[in-house]
Amino acid sequence: MHSSVITFPGSNCDRDMDVALKKFGFKNKMVWHDDVELPKSDLVVLPGGFSYGDYLRCGSMASKSKIMKSVLNFAQGGGKVMGVCNGFQILVESGLLPGVLLRNKYLEFICKNVFVKANNKDNSYFKDDKKNIYEFHIAHNEGNYFCSNDQIKEINDNNQIALFYSDENGNVNEQSNPNGSLQNIAGVFNKQKNVLGMMPHPERMIDPALSGEDGSIFFQNLINNLK
């Protein structure tokens, strides 16, 4: 399985993602934002960080990078694209995913572990995974997912919500919502379920000595389903 991680000016989780992908068997290549062509890829990842210093809006400038034309074409052709944190913001800004990501409810940067509940398993990212609740790390200032009434109806009708913020027992409620996201949304798919955006960082949870192993379960399941 071949993967590509896009590095933008200000990305700071690209190397973590590279380590995670290689650990679970991907042949990964790092791709610079100014490149025009994607290498052979079964999966393209837009990593976390602060692309272009988060100027204008988070992910706005990165969404106009040269490489994004190839990413858009790859996704529109059915290729698997995953955006984590700032990568999620870039996917929203590029129009590959619906909605927007606003400032956190209490206007504070949030950096902590959270529990998330997988909602839809009819896709390559969570299919066949027996685990429903993951403990992942979040670190963001603009992770408050929002969209219009028409959009949220369509998202629910199409089963596009990938992850909910929850407690450790899978209860989705206001108490388990760290940033004010609409309906506790932590991640969404496009209609075709080949593009995933998520605020939590699975790549930070692949070593039990440092953090936890729930990210390992996510990546192992992902490569199994892409084979």
From Swiss-Prot:
Principal cellular location given in the protein's record: cytoplasm
Catalytic activity: N(2)-formyl-N(1)-(5-phospho-beta-D-ribosyl)glycinamide + L-glutamine + ATP + H2O = 2-formamido-N(1)-(5-O-phospho-beta-D-ribosyl)acetamidine + L-glutamate + ADP + phosphate + H(+); L-glutamine + H2O = L-glutamate + NH4(+)
CDD domains named among the record's database cross-references: GATase1_FGAR_AT (cd01740)
GO cellular component, one term: cytoplasm
InterPro entries assigned: Class_I_gatase-like, PRibForGlyAmidine_synth_PurQ
Active site annotation, chain numbering: C85 (nucleophile), H201, E203
Pathway participation: Purine metabolism; IMP biosynthesis via de novo pathway; 5-amino-1-(5-phospho-D-ribosyl)imidazole from N(2)-formyl-N(1)-(5-phospho-D-ribosyl)glycinamide: step 1/2
PANTHER family documented for this protein: PHOSPHORIBOSYLFORMYLGLYCINAMIDINE SYNTHASE SUBUNIT PURQ (PTHR47552:SF1)
Protein name: Phosphoribosylformylglycinamidine synthase subunit PurQ
